[in-house]
């Protein structure tokens, strides 16, 4: 179980409250698919993924990125109970989608990068540390069903 201090929770929510879910979600998922192209196999029904430009301009990628960040928002609201919050998604990704759990960590790292570009001045090392702790906690919660 991950424990967040009051300061870490405040650092996370101060950024989260300003996040444009579609923009940041689409950019995060798009970067994942570009930087780690093997992850594209999970999105073969999403249309044209032939280039970075095609991926970043793909409306289905943006929509799914928004969906991913909407789910992450549940984690932001329930930081002290990530395992239970993501139990259903862990089961879905393990049993039905067969997603390599390492991909959750990669996606979390992409999110931290995207947030740092969108909120450069506010994204201090302390804020980054809090976000890194959150995305690792979420990745571990999503990986729980695999163990």
Curated annotation (Swiss-Prot):
* BP GO terms, sorted: carbon dioxide transport; negative regulation of transcription by RNA polymerase II; oxygen transport
Q: What residue stretches are annotated with the Globin domain?
A: 3-147
Recorded superkingdom: Eukaryota
| Stored Pfam families | Globin (PF00042)
Q: Which organism encodes this protein? A: Mus musculus (Mouse)
Give Gene Ontology CC terms.
hemoglobin complex
Complexes and interactors: Heterotetramer of two alpha chains and two beta chains.
Concerning InterPro entries, the annotation shows: Globin, Globin-like_sf, Globin/Proto, Hemoglobin_b, Hemoglobin_oxygen_transport
What are the entry keywords? Heme, Iron, Metal-binding, Oxygen transport, Transport
What is known about the tissue distribution of this protein? Red blood cells.
Molecular function terms from GO: heme binding; hemoglobin alpha binding; metal ion binding; oxygen binding; oxygen carrier activity; protein-containing complex binding
User: Which family does the record assign?
Assistant: Belongs to the globin family.
For this protein, the record's SUPFAM superfamilies field holds: Globin-like
Q: Does the keyword Metal-binding apply?
A: yes
Q: Where does heme b bind?
A: 64, 93
Q: What does this protein do?
A: This is an embryonic beta-type chain.
Q: What is this protein called?
A: Hemoglobin subunit beta-H1
């Amino acid at each position: 179980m991950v424990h967040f201090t009051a300061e870490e929770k405040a650092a996370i929510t101060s950024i989260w409250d300003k996040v444009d879910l579609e923009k940041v979600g689409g950019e995060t998922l798009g970067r994942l698919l570009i930087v780690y192209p093997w992850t594209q196999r999970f999105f073969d029904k999403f249309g044209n993924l032939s280039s970075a430009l095609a991926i970043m301009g793909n409306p289905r990628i943006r929509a799914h990125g928004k969906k991913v960040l909407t789910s992450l928002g549940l984690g932001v609201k329930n930081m002290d109970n990530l395992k239970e919050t993501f139990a259903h998604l862990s089961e879905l990704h393990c049993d039905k989608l067969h997603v390599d759990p390492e991909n959750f960590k990669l996606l979390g790292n992409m999110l931290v990068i995207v947030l740092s570009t969108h909120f450069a001045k506010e994204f201090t090392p302390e804020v980054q540390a809090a976000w890194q702790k959150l995305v690792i906690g979420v990745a571990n919660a999503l990986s729980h069903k695999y163990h």
